[in-house]
Curated annotation (Swiss-Prot):
Annotated localization: Cytoplasm
Main location: cytoplasm
Keyword Cytoplasm: yes
Region described as Disordered: 1-44
Cellular component, GO, one term: cytosol
NCBIfam families hit by this protein: PRK14139.1, PRK14140.1, PRK14150.1
Job description of the protein: Participates actively in the response to hyperosmotic and heat shock by preventing the aggregation of stress-denatured proteins, in association with DnaK and GrpE. It is the nucleotide exchange factor for DnaK and may function as a thermosensor. Unfolded proteins bind initially to DnaJ; upon interaction with the DnaJ-bound protein, DnaK hydrolyzes its bound ATP, resulting in the formation of a stable complex. GrpE releases ADP from DnaK; ATP binding to DnaK triggers the release of the substrate protein, thus completing the reaction cycle.
Domain of life per record: Bacteria
Residue stretches of biased makeup (Low complexity): 16-30
A Pfam family this chain is assigned to: GrpE
Name used for this protein in its record: Protein GrpE
Family the entry assigns: Belongs to the GrpE family.
Length: 199
């Protein structure tokens, strides 16, 4: 074969290679375009899914906050109700405090009267004793209790120490003499006992 044939052969090979390259490029372009189209279609879908997940998380957080607010509100209402009940109970319990304090003066006077009645007619003395017992019993029925007994341990919440002195037969820091009885109303001190304490 001649140079011309070789030349034709080379031209033919180049032409074939060019055609193959063009076909390959077209095929590649056709393969890439659907991928790009799919990627473009997936991106909005993925964005929508991400947005839905974001909104679901926001709604879950909002529900959690709302439940927390409701729980706190219920607890606050319960606390207010309980405090109101306690206030009413205390008001009922301690409504008699002023009256009880005034009645303690009467009890003290009856006790002093009983001490002064030594050697007086027994019928008068027993009448005063019965009056004293009746009054003390009535006060006890309403929650008023006497505190401060000789030999009892000194308690600064219930007793007011006037002085300390040595006392035979009584332990240190125990009441040796009761100068004036103390009283509590449902456990609350309405008048401390005035006492002398053994040293």
């Amino acid at each position: 074969m001649t140079n011309q044939t070789e030349k034709e052969q080379v031209e033919q090979d180049v032409s074939q290679a060019t055609e193959l390259a063009q076909e390959a490029q077209e095929a590649q372009t056709q393969d890439v375009e659907p991928e790009l189209q799919q990627n473009n279609e997936i991106d909005p879908l993925e964005e929508a899914i991400a947005r839905v997940q974001e909104l679901e998380a926001y709604i879950a957080e909002a529900d959690k906050r709302e439940q927390d607010i409701q729980l706190r509100a219920r607890a606050e209402v319960e606390n207010i109700r309980r405090r109101a009940e306690q206030d009413v109970e205390k008001a009922h319990k301690f409504a008699l405090e002023k009256f009880s304090k005034e009645m303690l003066t009467v009890v003290d006077n009856l006790e002093r009267g009983l001490q002064a009645l030594e050697g007086v007619d027994e019928s008068v003395k027993s009448g005063v004793e019965l009056t004293h017992k009746g009054l003390v019993s009535t006060l006890n029925n309403f929650g008023v209790e006497a505190v401060g007994v000789v030999g009892e341990a000194f308690n600064p919440e219930l007793h007011q120490a006037i002085s300390m002195q040595p006392a035979e037969g009584i332990e240190a820091n125990h009441i040796s003499v009761v100068l004036q009885k103390g009283y509590t109303l449902h456990g609350r001190v309405i008048r401390p006992a005035m006492v002398m304490v053994a040293s």
